[in-house]
């Protein structure tokens, strides 16, 4: 977090509360990266005064997924881009909308799809997340991949609305969870709509012998505790 604070203090007009919010996001965003099989870069607008239009953006944080290979071999933290050089980042900051309909771009040997997500806090967009995925890995997703991505998209929508992570609650996850260890998805009634293979194995080791999907998680937990 020391590097994050240094970058924010030197090139941006981010306030103390905004900086705290970005630290909360970075503390929990491994989950976002893993669920979307993507590298994430956090961009903050560069400007000398809050009343001035940004001259560009600076990358203040970067996370690589544990569920897929990275698309960035070199460190990108501290990189700067001028306004207009990355229109999708500009647009997410200006409009507050998630920018998804972008054409893949070739970077080295990889065809990379970029999406940008505004980070909303107290009535304004304070930063932008750029999400970078290998387009080749997106062509034939299975049930697990589709569920991961759908969950990720819900969480990114919450980020754009200022609802994830929960404010001033500390990190939700201690230690930081690995999606690959097992994931369960619930519907609004608490019923399991999807359980990854590792999640099923974990419940099996606890003594559960039936199907998980379609069952109420609370009822399942009561039977294995």
Residue ranges and their predicted role:
Residues 1-17, 153-160:
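Extracellular/periplasmic ligand-binding regions of membrane signal-transduction receptors
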Residues 108-118:
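A short beta-strand signature within small-molecule sensing/ligand-binding domains used
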Residues 10, 45-46, 52-85, 144-152, ...:
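PAS-family sensory domains
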């Amino acid at each position: 977090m020391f590097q994050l604070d240094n970058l924010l203090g030197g090139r941006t007009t981010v306030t103390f509360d905004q900086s705290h919010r970005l630290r909360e996001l970075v503390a929990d965003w491994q989950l976002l990266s893993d669920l979307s099989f993507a590298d994430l870069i956090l961009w903050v607008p560069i400007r000398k005064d809050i009343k001035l239009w940004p001259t560009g953006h600076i990358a203040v944080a970067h996370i690589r997924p544990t569920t897929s290979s990275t698309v960035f071999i070199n460190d990108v933290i501290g990189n700067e881009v001028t306004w207009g050089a990355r229109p999708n980042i500009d647009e997410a900051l200006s409009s507050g909308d998630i920018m998804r309909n972008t054409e893949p771009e070739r970077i080295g040997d990889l065809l990379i799809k970029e999406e940008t997500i505004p980070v909303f806090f107290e009535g304004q967009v304070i930063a932008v997340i750029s999400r970078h995925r290998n387009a080749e890995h997106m062509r034939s997703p299975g049930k697990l991949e589709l569920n991961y991505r759908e969950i990720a998209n819900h969480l990114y929508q919450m980020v754009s609305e200022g609802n994830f992570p929960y404010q001033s609650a500390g990190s939700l996850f201690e230690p930081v969870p690995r999606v690959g260890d097992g994931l369960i998805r619930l519907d609004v009634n608490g019923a399991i709509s999807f359980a990854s293979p590792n999640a099923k194995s974990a419940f099996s080791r606890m003594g559960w012998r039936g199907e998980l999907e379609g069952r109420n998680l609370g009822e399942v937990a009561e039977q294995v505790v």
